[in-house]
Regions:
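Helix-start (N-cap) detector for alpha-helical repeat units in TPR-like alpha-solenoids
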Residues: 6, 40-41, 74-75, 108-109, ...
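Alpha-helical linker/edge segments of TPR/alpha-solenoid repeat scaffolds
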Residues: 218-244
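Register position in tetratricopeptide repeats
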Residues: 18, 52-53, 86-87, 120-121, ...
Length: 310
């Protein structure tokens, strides 16, 4: 009876994950593990659920536990690969996905993970080959379609990206990744309001969705020149990391001081004053920009009505 109950809890967790109820799935899996604490498949699935909940440290513990319990289990290595990707350990992730494919060469999810790894490492050709192989093994998989669409859009193939998004949405109308991809296509075409509607559609399903918030922010940035400039500057600085962004700011400040000094030495005091004012304006703008953007976004999110089953 206990084993049957565990299997029911596992199946229920799968259904919960499929509809986006990540916390519910975590609770179901913890109940199952309280009865079968050494079941590697449950640990692997719990790791995937914890990763979806952005609890990567807990996910790593569960994934490593699954591999330790069953080194021959492909899904344990596959899940460990995704967890390592969350830590930006691309070499470790490649090793885990490689081991998963050694054990199960026809596992579409492992091929998809390998494709995402190549994409993260900026190897688009290798990423496309791996994801297309995953799609060959599991035709119509919306995640693979969206990943291929992302590669198409990044390469400037807008129509191909649109076709991928529409194919995924045809079978899965509420698929978050497909909605975000379609929104990105619309943004690239300058159809900002329609892109915003796709972002709202995502947020109705999950108000914490990073994809939905990312798309909504991008749409807001397109609708306001000042907010758009701040958004692009912030995105650029965030991509550098803390250390490099500090170096950039220090470099800009030093360059500004040198320029002002040079202008004064050349007798161009008016130009030096303008340069000083421009720096002050830049400093104030980057200081108040986050608050203005957050307030604008909060007004947008206030209009979102969540689904009843969220």
């Amino acid at each position: 009876v206990s084993e049957h109950h565990v299997r029911l809890l596992e199946e229920h967790a799968h259904r919960q994950l499929a509809r986006g109820d990540v916390q519910g799935a975590i609770e179901s899996l913890r109940q199952a593990l309280s009865q079968e604490p050494d079941e590697p498949g449950l640990h692997a699935l719990l790791a995937a659920a914890l990763l979806a909940a952005r609890r990567r440290h807990a996910a790593r513990l569960e994934a490593e536990r699954a591999v330790a319990l069953a080194p021959e289990l492909p899904e344990a290595h596959r899940t460990l690969g995704y967890v390592r990707m969350a830590f930006r350990d691309l070499r470790g992730a490649a090793e885990a996905f490689g081991r998963a494919l050694d054990l199960a060469p026809d596992d579409p999810h492992a091929h998809l993970g390998l494709g995402r790894l190549h994409a993260a490492a900026r190897r688009p050709a290798a990423a496309r080959a791996a994801i297309e192989h995953a799609l060959l093994l599991d035709p119509g998989d919306p995640d693979a379609l969206v990943d291929l669409g992302d590669l198409d859009l990044d390469a400037g193939r807008r129509e191909a990206a649109r076709a991928r998004a529409l194919e995924a949405l045809q079978s899965f109308p509420e698929h978050e990744g497909a909605l975000e991809l379609m929104g990105r296509v619309l943004l690239a075409e300058g159809r900002t309001e329609e892109a915003r509607e796709h972002a709202i559609a995502i947020l109705r399903q999950d108000a914490t969705s990073r994809g939905g918030l990312r798309l909504l922010c991008a749409a807001k940035a397109r609708r306001s020149l000042l907010l758009g400039l701040w958004w692009r500057w912030n995105a650029f600085m965030s991509s550098l990391g803390d250390g490099r962004s500090i170096l950039v700011l220090v470099g800009l400040y030093v360059a500004q001081r040198l320029a002002v000094t040079a202008l004064k030495d050349a007798g161009a005091t008016e130009a030096a004053g303008i340069a000083s004012l421009a720096w002050i304006a830049f400093a104030v703008y980057t200081w108040i920009g986050p608050a203005v953007f957050a307030r604008s976004l909060a007004r947008e999110l206030a209009a979102v009505r969540l689904r009843a089953d969220f």
